[in-house]
UniProtKB/Swiss-Prot annotation:
Its cofactor is pyridoxal 5'-phosphate. Transmembrane segments: none annotated. It catalyses: L-histidinol phosphate + 2-oxoglutarate = 3-(imidazol-4-yl)-2-oxopropyl phosphate + L-glutamate. InterPro entries: Aminotransferase_I/II_large, HisP_aminotrans, HistidinolP_aminotransfase, PyrdxlP-dep_Trfase, PyrdxlP-dep_Trfase_major, PyrdxlP-dep_Trfase_small. Homodimer. The gene is hisC. It comes from Bdellovibrio bacteriovorus (strain ATCC 15356 / DSM 50701 / NCIMB 9529 / HD100). It comes from the Bacteria. This is Histidinol-phosphate aminotransferase. GO terms for molecular function: histidinol-phosphate transaminase activity; pyridoxal phosphate binding. The lineage of its organism: Bacteria, Pseudomonadati, Bdellovibrionota, Bdellovibrionia, Bdellovibrionales. Its EC number is 2.6.1.9. Pathway: Amino-acid biosynthesis; L-histidine biosynthesis; L-histidine from 5-phospho-alpha-D-ribose 1-diphosphate: step 7/9.
């Protein structure tokens, strides 16, 4: 049976190495995973309390309308429910947007070294991914992305993805850059602009602004959020979308009726209201980043100041060898060869003792492996 060439050539997304796999592979008992940008505090306590109360109802199907969660989202984010949609993680939102808007050989535009999910979802939906080189400092080059779109109508670009802040680089587009970009490509009928703001809550930069503030001005603007990071609910798989009502209506037609399970809805609803946990998550992130910066500087390793809960740094060595040596010491970081970075690793913020163990192990490994 013939398989589509787009599917055959698709390079699957490779997530961070699991703790259990590392323990089995290297014969370890203690392993610290600092590879997947998870919340080191775990899930929101209020979310877990709500989940425990909901366990007795799991013989029933989940609410297909996501009513309670949408009501809370509307209250917290200030948008009517007709502009909000829920997905099985941001991955489902990205995938279905590609399915909705792209026909065979249509284009999806983003940056080099952008979140890898765009590069997976586009060909999976028979579209073609186009990537513009990053600007200096590993930043999204929004002027170049806008110019590429405007100068290449033959590419039939239907979606533009901007991850802000970006994973894995941790860099961001400023408010002024976002505004200039939207003035060039906003309010068009031939393309949707999607800002993926999974790390929005961790941003410390004063000149950053969420694209949600421009929702009323641009009819082709979509904003994505996740519950996997600041809310600590990665295992529940839940993402949210802010979009024009007509986009939400079509999305809800295409998604599976029970795309988000009941426990995920209950957990997210409670987590949104756990302000103390959100603040604690921010503080542990910022403290951890500052610690990493200090230690990386002591080790003489270049790094990129991050607006996420992770930092990308240059080992100045073959990162695959560094990563292997770290794994043997029970430290899981994230190699970035699939993003084109041969000497870089991405390091997620953990608890204090995990961060310290990671830096001790890294210092040992650097002495063993010769710089390039």
């Amino acid at each position: 049976m013939k398989i589509s060439p787009e599917i055959l050539n698709l390079v699957p997304y490779k997530p961070g190495k699991p703790i259990s796999e590392t323990q089995r592979e290297y014969g370890l008992t203690t392993v610290y995973k600092l590879a997947s940008n998870e919340n080191p505090l775990g899930p929101s306590p209020k979310a877990m309390a709500a989940v425990k109360q909901a366990l007795d109802h799991q013989h029933l199907y989940p609410d297909p309308s996501h009513y309670e969660l949408l009501q809370t989202l509307s209250k917290e984010w200030g948008f009517p429910t007709k502009q909000l949609a829920i997905g099985n993680g941001s991955d489902e939102l990205i995938d279905l947007l590609c399915r909705i808007y792209c026909e065979h050989h249509d284009g999806v535009l983003t940056s080099a070294a952008a979140f890898n999910a765009y590069e997976v979802s586009a060909p999976a939906n028979r579209a073609v991914i186009h990537k513009v080189p990053m600007a200096e400092g590993y930043r999204f080059d929004l002027p170049a992305i806008a110019d590429y779109f405007l100068k290449h109508p033959e590419k039939n670009i239907r979606l533009i993805f901007v991850s802000n802040p970006n994973n894995p680089t941790g860099t961001y587009a400023t408010k002024a850059e976002v505004e200039a970009f939207l003035q060039k490509v906003g309010n068009r009928d031939d393309v949707m602009i999607i800002f993926d703001e999974a790390y929005n809550e961790f941003v410390r930069a004063k000149d950053y602004a969420s694209a949600q503030g421009y929702m009323g001005q641009y009819k082709n603007l979509i904003v994505l959020r996740t519950f996997s990071k600041i809310y600590g609910l990665a295992g529940f798989r839940l993402g949210a979308m802010i979009a024009p009502p007509e986009v939400v209506e079509v999305f809800n037609r295409v998604r599976k009726p029970f795309n988000v399970n009941d426990l995920a809805q209950v957990a997210a609803n409670a987590a949104l209201q756990d302000k103390e946990f959100i603040e604690r998550s921010q503080q542990i992130c910022w403290k951890g980043l500052d610690y990493f910066y200090k230690k990386l500087e002591e080790l003489g390793l270049p790094y990129i100041p991050s607006q996420g809960n992770f930092v990308m740094f240059d080992t100045l060595r073959d990162a695959a060898k560094v990563n292997e040596a770290l794994l043997r010491r029970g430290i899981i970081m994230r190699p970035l060869l699939n993003y084109g970075f041969k000497t870089h690793l991405r390091l997620s913020v953990g608890r204090d003792h995990e961060n310290e163990a990671a830096m001790v192990a890294l210092a040992e490994v650097l002495k063993e492996i010769t710089p390039l």
